[in-house]
């Protein structure tokens, strides 16, 4: 009968799991287990400790029901190195890998040996693996990546395989890639039910919660895990082992009180950096609010899909994958749909749970309403924003709170040019928010009537995915009098708004819920020319009635703009009035409004 070595990498922090694994080892139905090699990473691992597994190993060695224990302390620093160290100590003909925190059924070894014994391939694995997340309390199946794929915890291989295959010692996860020659080696696939049940928890070497989170937002056809109507109890039929796992899981599930007064959770949002100078309005709002709260002595954390992490202006910016949704929070703010979903499905614990909506996308509103009783406050940016949600859902937003975005007053009060160009205008919003009509239907008439007119366009096409639309826009942006500057930092935008006479934003875009850029133009003295649609009714400037996109109406609009360009008296009058607009509110005052809301019972 083929002698087998079990190989496990472990750590003092996971000694409770290792104890349960020893019970799984004793329950194996394969009779010729020669040894159990255990590599202890306690002193060199990712969570270094002052204690190691020595005492537990002595218990194992005194347990006559366990195979011979080969114990060594790791000397390398990463998972690939530890696995290579383990392979250097094995003496069995077949090595069966077992992770310390996974459950292995009694036929794990016998099934692997049976599949490997004819040596049609030197390595076996399981591409379609079960795993259970203890906090989501959900049972999943990996859909699989192919016949030559497996994670290490499912692998078994002949000892001669390691004569020509090693792990990459420089990586902290995905060490299997090099060991399997980029998953090109022929691999026998083991049966899922006979191999492993992997557990996802908060002390995994690799955090699988990111996999679950990402899977929630992927389209059905590309999801790589499947939620199963299955329970751990169905898979583990040994009462003692099952109860041992439940004891550990209940400890790990216990909520810990957050160290932060305010947590802003952004989820798997499009990636950005808190150091960027050319952010959109929603991202700006996070930075300015968090910074103002920190100035008031609040301990603030922002969890997001960020480029830069660390403490910036008193705020801690943290990878969203490190957010522990099962903990207890004081103030927890879920930002847009990215922060709201999927965690709203679960039992979030917070004294106050707020959803900072920002967007006006109808599809998520039904989902939001489904969980409305969990939410303390819906944070909306305008009366239009609130009314729009109520109209779409047919429900009153009784706990909706209108707090608009603030304005960077000091920045936009700084004039960096001496005079304005009378015939210069700017557009400073996403290019899908009305720019096409301006460029195709209105601008050609304006420029024909007044060849000195200029339109300077800012924002860029990074968020536009329709290549045909991009191509069409590029052509429109190349017409006389139009200059496309793309994405630019605040200093350039401020300079533009002090050079331009008007901010031309004639739009009926329903997704505009506040319009920070218009309020910034008021501060800079750049007179907004806006429609009377949606939120624009609530913003100050020259309002033009929203008219259908026809040649006659576009000509009417163009003529009104021409009149404004030539009437310097009305320009100065408007500029003096608009600089005192009640919509110009500093971020400091807006942050205080939020704080007052936090402090209400």
From Swiss-Prot:
EC number: 2.4.-.-
GO molecular function: glycosyltransferase activity
KW Transferase (keyword) present: yes
Record keywords: Glycosyltransferase, Transferase
Pfam families: Glycos_transf_2
Protein family membership: Belongs to the glycosyltransferase 2 family.
Protein name according to UniProt: Uncharacterized glycosyltransferase L193
Annotated source species: Acanthamoeba polyphaga mimivirus
Classification lineage: Viruses, Varidnaviria, Bamfordvirae, Nucleocytoviricota, Megaviricetes
């Amino acid at each position: 009968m083929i002698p087998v070595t079990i190989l496990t990498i472990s750590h003092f922090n996971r000694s409770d799991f290792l104890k349960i694994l020893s019970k799984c080892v004793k329950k194996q139905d394969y009779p010729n287990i020669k040894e159990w090699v255990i590599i202890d990473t306690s002193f060199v691992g990712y969570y270094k400790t002052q204690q190691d597994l020595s005492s537990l190993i002595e218990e194992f060695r005194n347990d006559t029901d366990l195979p011979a224990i080969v114990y060594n302390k790791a000397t390398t620093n990463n998972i690939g190195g530890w696995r290579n160290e383990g392979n250097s100590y094995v003496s069995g003909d077949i090595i069966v890998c077992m992770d310390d925190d996974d459950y292995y059924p009694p036929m794990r070894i016998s099934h692997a040996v049976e599949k490997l014994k004819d040596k049609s391939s030197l390595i076996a694995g399981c591409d379609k693996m079960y795993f259970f997340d203890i906090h989501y309390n959900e049972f999943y199946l990996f859909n699989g990546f192919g016949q030559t794929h497996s994670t290490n915890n499912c692998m078994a291989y002949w000892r001669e395989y390691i004569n020509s295959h090693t792990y990459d010692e420089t990586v902290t996860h995905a060490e299997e890639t090099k060991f399997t020659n980029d998953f090109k080696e022929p691999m026998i696939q083991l049966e899922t039910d006979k191999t492993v049940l992997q557990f996802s928890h908060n002390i995994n070497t690799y955090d699988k919660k990111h996999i679950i989170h990402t899977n929630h937002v992927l389209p059905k056809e590309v999801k790589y895990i499947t939620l199963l109507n299955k329970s751990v109890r169905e898979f583990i039929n040994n009462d003692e082992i099952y109860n041992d796992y439940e004891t550990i899981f209940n400890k790990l599930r216990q909520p810990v009180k957050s160290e932060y007064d305010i947590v802003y959770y952004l989820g798997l949002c499009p990636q950005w950096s808190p150091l960027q100078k050319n952010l959109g309005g929603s991202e700006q709002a996070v930075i300015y609010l968090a910074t103002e709260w920190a100035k008031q002595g609040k301990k603030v954390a922002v969890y997001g899909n960020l480029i830069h992490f660390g403490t910036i202006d008193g705020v801690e910016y943290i990878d969203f994958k490190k957010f522990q949704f099962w903990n207890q929070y004081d103030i927890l703010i879920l930002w847009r749909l990215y922060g709201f979903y999927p965690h709203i499905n679960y039992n979030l614990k917070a004294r106050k749970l707020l959803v900072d909506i920002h967007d006006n996308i109808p599809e998520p509103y039904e989902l939001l309403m489904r969980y409305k009783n969990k939410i303390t406050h819906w944070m909306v940016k305008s009366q239009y924003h609130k009314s729009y949600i109520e109209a779409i859902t047919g429900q009153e937003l009784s706990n909706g709170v209108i707090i608009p975005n603030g304005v960077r007053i000091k920045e936009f009060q700084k004039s960096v040019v001496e005079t304005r160009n009378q015939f210069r205008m700017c557009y400073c919003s996403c290019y899908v928010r009305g720019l096409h009509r301006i460029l195709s239907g209105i601008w050609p008439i304006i420029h024909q009537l007044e060849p000195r007119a200029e339109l300077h366009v800012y924002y860029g096409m990074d968020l536009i995915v329709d290549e045909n639309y991009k191509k069409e826009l590029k052509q429109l942006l190349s017409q006389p009098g139009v200059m496309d500057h793309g994405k630019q930092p605040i200093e350039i935008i401020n300079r533009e708004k002090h050079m331009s006479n008007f901010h031309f934003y004639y739009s009926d875009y329903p997704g505009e819920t506040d319009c920070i850029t218009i309020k910034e133009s008021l501060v800079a003295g750049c007179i907004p020319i806006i429609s009377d649609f949606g939120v624009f009714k609530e913003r100050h400037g020259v309002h033009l009635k929203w008219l259908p996109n026809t040649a006659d109406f576009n000509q009417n609009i163009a003529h009104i703009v021409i009149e404004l360009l030539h009437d310097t008296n009305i320009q100065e009058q408007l500029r003096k009035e608009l600089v005192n607009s009640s919509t110009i509110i500093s971020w400091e005052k807006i942050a205080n409004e939020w704080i007052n809301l936090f402090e209400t019972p």
